Amino acid sequence: MIRAYESKDLPLMIAIWNEVVEEGIAFPQEEALSEETGKAFFEEQTYCGVAEVDGKVVGLYILHPNNVGRCGHICNASYAVSSSCRGLHIGEKLVLDCLEQAAKHGFRVLQFNAVVESNLHARHLYERLGFVQLGTIPGGFRMKDGHYENICPYYHEV
């Protein structure tokens, strides 16, 4: 089940987010969220959805504008699924809910700025759901081990 986050979800949301940050292969952030910074980070999003399995938060997404003004109708999102629950199609449910929420919040396009080229599971999911790759940015992502990988921006009309 996907639903809007509540303050009681913050500890698990922060833990899941930090797990992806620590892996260093998908999110651009390098610093883990603390209880305080995590609360502020999630509160400032346009929308945050969480995935629950058996009453426990196992995944989440954040949704926010990708730009301002005349480009403010384009949004951006990030997804995180607990490593113990990957491969269960939770990411797909999060993306589909995100597209619905983007429309409800008045966005017209969902754009992913920095999908790492080697993140094949995410790329195949996005393409299966109708996202279009905009090109490739050579060496656009610095992996945790220090080497650079290409990133692939994607978009989907909402």
Task: Place the predicted regions along the sequence by residue.
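Conserved GNAT acetyl-CoA-binding A-motif
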Residues: 102-115
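Terminal substrate-recognition subdomain of acyl/acetyltransferases
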Residues: 79, 137, 144-158
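Conserved beta-strand-loop-alpha-helix junction that forms the acyl-donor binding cleft
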Residues: 86, 112-122, 140-145
